Curated annotation (Swiss-Prot):
This is Dynein axonemal assembly factor 4. PROSITE patterns: CS, TPR, TPR_REGION. It comes from the Eukaryota. TPR repeats lie at residues 288-321, 323-355, 364-397. Residues 7-103 are annotated as: Mediates interaction with ESR1 and STUB1. Residues 165-192 have a biased composition (Basic and acidic residues). Keywords: Cell projection, Cytoplasm, Neurogenesis, Nucleus, Repeat, TPR repeat.
């Protein structure tokens, strides 16, 4: 039975009450204080002090200061009046028990509200951090796009300048081609004037020679001005076999591959962006692919909780994309949420059907991640089954082979110990 303390002193004003309680040599670390609206208790073994207050107080503003073997309480009254006494008069045991239980329930409700408020503030902080990160990356993306646009404009200006130079050069060449025949004609005319000034010495056989020279001049001009006609246009029709998968037709499973492609197309159309809870999101935040890339970047920076938030939002938008569950399983593995990693890996395997070459790598990763989670839960037999399923998909993967061999050794060692 604790020893009840009756030695204390108190003073009051209309707004507050001051209570001094000696600890009687007990270490202050062993003192436990509980304060409610109508109930105050201090437990410092082997002593116990409790009082059922005359009127309600504001336990949120009230405070206690411990020091020098004394606890000094400053209790703020809800109604600014002077009390006739510290404790409530005429209180029996049943009423005391009711007041105690009521005070404990009120304290529990306040603690629950404080926990919920703290969790809500934490979620808001995470959302704000994610939004700020998205904003920074959007600014970087815009900056890169502006740089690309400036480079494109610069290249366009340089190309236009080059075209203008080419036009000027072509114009000069055309002028030169036109001037050459005129210069030849003038030279011929000067040569024709010389025999007229000396007719006696001019041989009669030079007239046809002059005619041949004129023919040569015009023939050269025609050769220079003659431009070949453009070639006639033509078109060649080419059609390819519509094969989406790279495997040979004799080795592929056409029906399964078509079913897989059909499921992928349906998954892309299965969006839930019209829900009221998504009305405050930006357009890019409603894109599961954009959220997946965002989660991948957060995973690369080891911010696994934020990555899970991004994958969660993407899954709420579209629940039929297996890679979202696969990536979230990797985050849960990093955070040791092993049961959730198993659930996400199983959901990814459920969506990765039918098994075709296009989803082989994803199925192998899902088996490995689920097997890893089983092994960390010490369920080695189940883990080995997943690793063997992964090896059936990719038999040449040496990492998976080595891990499967280690699991076999662990299982064999456990079996030998049980026999011993």
């Amino acid at each position: 039975m604790p020893v009840r303390v009756s030695e204390f002193s108190w003073q009051q004003t209309p707004a507050a009450l001051f209570l001094s309680l000696p600890l009687r040599g007990v270490c202050v670390r062993d003192a436990d204080v509980f304060c409610g609206e109508s109930y105050l208790k201090v437990n410092f073994p082997p002593f116990l002090f409790e009082v059922f207050l005359y009127a309600p107080i504001d336990d949120g503003k009230s405070k206690a200061k411990i020091g020098n073997d004394t606890i000094l309480f400053t209790l703020y009254k809800k109604e600014p009046v002077l009390w006739e006494s510290l404790s409530m008069p005429g209180v029996d045991k049943e009423m005391m028990q009711r007041i105690r239980e009521k005070s404990i329930l009120q304290a529990q409700e306040k603690a629950k509200e404080a926990t919920e408020a703290k969790a809500a503030a934490k979620r808001e902080d995470q959302r704000y951090a994610l939004g700020e990160m998205m904003k920074i990356e959007e600014e970087e993306r815009k900056k890169i796009e502006d740089m690309k646009e400036n480079e494109r404009k610069k290249a366009t200006r340089e190309l236009e300048a080059w075209k203008e130079c080419q036009k000027k050069a072509d114009g000069q060449k055309r002028v030169q081609r036109k001037e050459k025949p005129l210069q030849g004609k003038q030279a011929e005319e000067r040569g024709a004037l010389k025999p007229q000034s000396l007719p006696r010495k001019a041989p009669p056989t030079r007239l046809p020679t002059r005619g041949r020279n004129w023919e040569n001049i015009f023939s050269e001009k025609l050769k220079e001005d003659r431009v070949p006609a453009p070639r006639s246009a033509g078109s060649i029709q080419i059609s390819f076999t519509p094969r989406v998968f790279p495997t040979a037709l004799r080795e592929s499973q056409v029906a399964e591959e078509e079913e897989w492609l059909h499921k992928q197309a349906e998954a892309r159309r299965a969006m839930s962006t019209d829900l009221p809870e998504f009305s405050d999101l930006k357009e890019e935040e409603k894109n599961p692919d954009w959220l997946k890339d965002k989660g991948n970047k957060l995973f690369a920076t080891e911010n696994y909780l934020a990555a899970i938030d991004a994958y969660n939002l993407a899954i709420r938008l579209n629940r039929k994309i297996p890679v979202l569950y696969l990536n979230r399983a990797a985050c849960h593995l990093k955070l040791k949420n092993l049961h959730k990693a198993i659930e996400d890996s199983s959901k990814a395997l459920e969506l990765l059907t039918p098994p075709v070459a296009d989803n082989a790598n994803a199925r192998m990763k899902a088996h490995v991640r689920r097997g890893t989670a089983f092994c960390q839960l010490e369920l080695y037999v189940e883990g080995l089954q997943d690793y063997e399923a992964a090896l059936k998909i990719d038999p040449a993967n040496t990492v998976v082979q080595n891990d499967a061999e280690k699991i076999r050794n662990i299982i064999q060692g456990t079996t030998l110990k049980s026999h011993d």
